[in-house]
A protein has these predicted regions:
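A conserved beta-strand/loop capping segment in the N-terminal third of enzymes
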Residues: 45-114
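Glycine-rich FAD pyrophosphate-binding loop
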Residues: 7, 23-49
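Beta1/beta-strand and adjacent pyrophosphate-binding region of the FAD-binding site
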Residues: 1-14, 32
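Glycine-rich loop(s) and the adjacent beta-strand/alpha-helix scaffold that form part
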Residues: 161-197
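An active-site-proximal "capping" alpha-helix that borders the catalytic cofactor pocket
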Residues: 8, 18, 171-175, 384-400
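A conserved short coil-to-beta-strand element within the FAD-binding core of flavoproteins
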Residues: 133-147
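Residue-level recognition of phosphate/Mg2+-coordinating polar/acidic sites
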Residues: 24-25, 39, 60-62, 80, ...
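Short hydrophobic core segments
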Residues: 7-9, 34, 137, 149, ...
Length: 400
């Protein structure tokens, strides 16, 4: 016997946004949200340090999707239908005015995620939506006309349409879909190089980091345990699966001056040697790097920092240029980025119709949010994917 028109598994951002949209667009539908945790929207509550980086400003969707290592191409169309602009309009229309920071991140003007949560719960509460917490699903199967959902408690539910909006869950594989393995994405790197970490606090605004053919550029921060910063986070995200295969033990190459070739750096050093032959190599960096970092690089090049420039043979200058453009750092592990625990993995994207977010394999089955093999570089982009897929799945269910 059908107990609900729609069951949504997962009371996170995507699931609750879908419930809120269904409450407004199809109030006649009986919607049941099943949440494994004690409260819905737990990750939204702590995102952005409790402030909730709701989305990111967007002037061009084609540029926006470049922030998604997996799923960017598939989200291009959906973002044109319900993207950052529409998200801002929706939340502001539901009592959550937003403010844009200098870095493009959008937060509630009140600086608290509770306003986002209250807006979603209040909107869902105006419709025919029931939310059950501490409720774990363990099995799903299709029958003619709907789906059966078996709970860990032994209870069985039935619905006409099913939206899965939760990450993980062995029950998904029973529906015939391919699950891409989940591995961490968006993390910083640890290193065993104590001389390097002794430089903690140094920021270099523009570097290129590379591993196994992958490259990323941006700022890099040396930390007490390793490296962080936009360049590292981008590399960790786009290289998530490759780095997982190494068990997070690999060598990362750092080019401290990506705007110049190694030959250009060498020529700069050669000119400085000609102009300032009596200066000691360690007292000044001709290429604009900080003194502490410069001293490490010349030491790794095998050059004594007290040596005068004029006494350095061309071979020594070549070695210094090689360190500037190809410093090798041993990586021995990873750390999560701040409070964000992003993973890649989930339903294989080609098995989903991104016009409707309906399964291409099982009619009446929809996906949104973390269950999809989509991830982004920062929390605001990840939440935008949740809002967009949740909204479009709900719209499709409402009109279907």
């Amino acid at each position: 016997m059908i107990s609900s028109d729609v069951i949504i598994i997962g009371g996170g951002a995507a699931g609750m946004f879908a419930a809120a949209v269904l409450a407004e667009e199809a109030p006649e539908l009986k919607v049941l949200v099943l949440e494994k945790g004690a409260k819905p929207l737990a990750k939204v509550r702590v995102s952005g340090g409790g402030r909730c980086n709701l989305t990111h400003e967007c002037s061009d969707i084609r540029t926006f999707v470049q922030n998604y290592p997996r799923g960017g191409a598939e989200l291009n169309g959906p973002f044109h239908r319900f993207g950052p602009t529409e998200t801002v309009e929706w939340f502001e229309a539901h009592g959550v005015p937003l403010v844009t920071l200098d870095d493009g991140c959008l937060f509630p003007k009140t600086d608290t995620s509770e306003d986002v949560i209250n807006a979603l719960l209040h909107t869902a509460g105006r419709g025919n939506v029931e939310i059950r917490t501490n409720t774990e699903c363990c099995k799903i199967w299709k029958f003619d006309g709907g789906f059966n959902v078996k709970l860990a408690s032994g209870e069985q539910l039935a619905c006409k349409k099913l939206l899965i909006a939760t990450g993980g869950g062995a029950f998904i594989e029973g529906l015939g879909h391919t699950i891409e393995p989940c591995v961490p994405s968006l993390f910083t790197f640890k290193t065993s190089d104590k001389e390097f970490t002794a430089l903690a606090g140094i920021v270099v605004e523009d570097v290129r980091v590379s591993v196994s053919g992958l490259k990323a550029e941006g700022a890099l921060l040396i930390t007490h345990g390793g490296v962080s910063g936009p360049a590292v986070l981008r590399l960790s995200s786009f290289g998530a699966r490759i780095l997982a295969e190494t068990n997070y033990r690999f060598e990362m190459k750092i080019n401290w001056l990506p705007a110049q070739s190694e030959e250009q750096v060498f020529q700069t050093l050669e000119k400085f040697r000609a102009v300032s032959p009596r200066k000691q190599v360690g007292t000044w960096s001709p290429v604009g790097l900080s003194s502490r970092l410069w001293k490490l690089l010349i030491a790794r090049a095998g050059v004594d920092e007290t040596r005068e420039w004029g006494a350095c043979p061309l071979k020594a200058l070549r070695h210094i240029a090689a360190q500037v453009c190809g410093f090798v750092l041993p990586i021995t592990g990873k750390n999560p980025h701040r409070e964000e625990f992003v993973t890649c993995g989930g339903i294989r994207l080609k098995e989903v119709n991104f016009q409707t977010l309906e399964s291409r394999l099982v009619p009446g089955l929809y996906f949104a949010g973390e269950v999809l093999d989509i991830d982004a570089l920062t929390g605001g982009f990840n939440l935008q994917a949740a809002w967009t897929t949740g909204y479009l799945a709900a719209q499709s269910i409402a009109v279907g």
